[in-house]
């Protein structure tokens, strides 16, 4: 199997973070590595990974102009990282050509697995012979990429990008989706697809234990307005208990605004952008984990926040709004905020504050057990491989 993904080897995380001016997506990289390791655990076949670094363009978003070709390995996994001149359009074209060149070195009967609707990858497989079977793992609808970019020019570019992506996506034979609602906007049609909300990876053997003080609420992820952070900050202003703290970790458009809030309220702690492992350790130290994303906007029903799975695996209680993309089987293990308002968020936080440490630990442990048993990467990738093999035998 050949896997195409915009990822970076885990040991290079600090190097990539240091060169990036706007942070990187820990969630996407972690998802891809869970996918790769889950497949590796379920098959004896060799795994080939062709990757491109998920970084912004030079010089505005990344410090390096020329990204080098690099061969790497991780156990029995062989990787080929395609380099490029890191400037718009040229970057995508070079990556497409290099990915296509690598694919032609492998047998035509190879099974290809593409992570996300990344244009250079779809472009590279578009003209491949039918013997190559292509499965696309789609975690986001292309129309909702870069939603924080609101200029007319950026909107025009996004529309053009979507048209090209959907044109090339016709070559995809089957899909892995995070929610069943995604099938319609992706124009899946009669092509087979499997719904896989997400997965969790390696976690510590023992769940964390609550500490009485302070009562800390943690958010880790992108610091963008569409994720409900303004509402969370407003709720914190309405919480007057001096022993309640709000911890924030990540990077994004609201970073400076959050620094200003933290300067005014000592209960708000901003940790900046942390490597994934440090963010996970911080999750285990928090009292509760919060996802303030509301159910507003069409994109919510097309996404299953990977943050939810990661939060639950940490063993801490999870406080969030009910989202259309999250199946009902998760309901017993999540604390839902009844209304999408700062007041309702405040009230939910106060109700959790009244629980004893042992009650909070029990809530977190039940959610942790659920995802570790039913949604771990080995179980989820076994489902994916069974789905692919079934489609192969039916073809």
Where in the sequence are the language-model features?
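N-terminal subdomain of nucleotide-sugar transferases
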Residues: 1-64, 234-239
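Membrane-proximal helix-turn-helix segments that form the acceptor-binding/catalytic region
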Residues: 33-37, 97-104, 123, 127, ...
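Conserved donor-binding/catalytic core segment of Leloir-type glycosyltransferases
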Residues: 2-4, 176, 208-227, 232-236, ...
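Nucleotide-activated donor-binding/catalytic signature segment of Leloir-type glycosyltransferases, i.e.
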Residues: 256-281, 288
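A charged, aromatic-enriched C-terminal amphipathic alpha-helix characteristic of glycosyltransferases
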Residues: 343, 354-389
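Acidic donor-binding loop of glycosyltransferase active sites
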Residues: 283-301, 316
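Donor nucleotide-sugar binding/catalytic pocket of nucleotide-sugar-dependent glycosyltransferases
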Residues: 27, 31, 158, 162-206
């Amino acid at each position: 199997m050949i896997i195409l993904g915009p990822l970076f080897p885990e040991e290079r995380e600090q190097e990539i973070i240091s060169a990036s001016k706007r942070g990187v997506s820990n969630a996407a990289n972690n998802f891809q590595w869970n996918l790769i390791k889950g497949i590796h655990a379920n098959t004896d076949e060799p795994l080939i990974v062709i990757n491109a670094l998920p970084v912004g363009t030079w010089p505005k978003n990344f410090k390096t102009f020329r990204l080098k070709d690099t061969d790497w390995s991780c156990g029995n996994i062989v990787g080929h990282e395609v380099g490029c001149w890191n400037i718009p359009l040229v970057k995508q074209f070079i990556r497409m050509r290099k990915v296509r060149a690598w694919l032609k070195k492998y047998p035509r009967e190879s099974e290809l697995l593409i992570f996300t609707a990344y244009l250079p990858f779809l472009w590279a497989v578009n003209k491949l012979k039918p013997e190559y079977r292509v499965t696309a793992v789609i975690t986001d609808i292309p129309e909702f990429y870069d939603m924080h970019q609101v200029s007319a020019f950026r909107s025009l570019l996004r529309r053009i990008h979507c048209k090209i992506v959907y044109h090339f996506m016709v070559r995809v034979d089957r899909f892995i989706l995070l929610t069943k609602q995604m099938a319609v906007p992706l124009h899946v049609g009669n092509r087979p697809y499997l719904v896989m909300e997400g997965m969790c990876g390696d976690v510590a053997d023992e769940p964390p234990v609550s500490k009485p003080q302070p009562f800390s609420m943690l958010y880790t992820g992108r610091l963008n307005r569409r994720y409900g952070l303004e509402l969370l900050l407003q709720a914190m202003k309405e919480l007057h208990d001096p022993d309640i703290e709000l911890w924030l970790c990540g990077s994004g458009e609201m970073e400076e605004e959050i620094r200003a809030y933290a300067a005014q309220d000592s209960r708000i702690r901003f940790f900046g952008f942390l490597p994934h492992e440090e963010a996970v350790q911080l999750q285990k130290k928090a009292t509760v984990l919060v996802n303030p994303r509301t159910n507003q906007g069409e994109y919510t029903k097309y996404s299953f926040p990977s943050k939810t799975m990661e939060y639950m695996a940490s063993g801490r209680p999870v406080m969030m709004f009910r989202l259309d993309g999250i199946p009902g089987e998760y309901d017993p293990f999540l604390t839902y905020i009844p209304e999408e308002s700062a007041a309702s968020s405040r009230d939910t936080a106060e109700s959790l504050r009244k629980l004893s440490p042992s009650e909070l630990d029990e809530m977190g442990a039940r959610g942790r057990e659920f995802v570790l048993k039913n949604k771990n990467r080995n179980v989820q990738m076994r489902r994916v491989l069974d789905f692919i093999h079934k489609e192969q035998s039916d073809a």
